[in-house]
């Protein structure tokens, strides 16, 4: 099981560390979503909804860690170069907004 990041960070930092995160966790981020958005990784409550720490910080559901990993791994496999962390974050944001 990977890590959960209950401390506030940025969406860029979370995407950079995605491989180390608990795949059962969820990413929450402040809108509008950018690489610099405040974000954290937490377990979704069993009853659903937002974890208390995300509500207090004004964060919204962004994407589940497992879905983010699967999407980025598939996207990267089709590229002819290694994307930068910023490119990965930008692409994941587009996916979360338009396809997830």
What kind of feature is each model-predicted range?
Residues 39-100:
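Amphipathic protein-protein interaction modules
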Residues 2-47, 54:
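Extended, charge-biased low-complexity segments
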């Amino acid at each position: 099981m990977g890590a959960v990041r209950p401390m506030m960070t940025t969406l860029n930092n979370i995407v950079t560390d995605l491989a180390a995160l608990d795949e059962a966790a969820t990413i929450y981020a402040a809108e509008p979503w950018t690489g610099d958005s405040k974000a954290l990784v937490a377990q979704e409550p069993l009853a659903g909804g937002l974890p208390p720490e995300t509500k207090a910080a004004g964060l919204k559901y962004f994407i589940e860690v497992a879905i983010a990993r699967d999407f980025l791994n598939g996207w990267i496999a089709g590229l002819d170069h290694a994307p930068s962390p910023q490119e990965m974050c930008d692409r994941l944001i587009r996916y979360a907004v338009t396809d997830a």
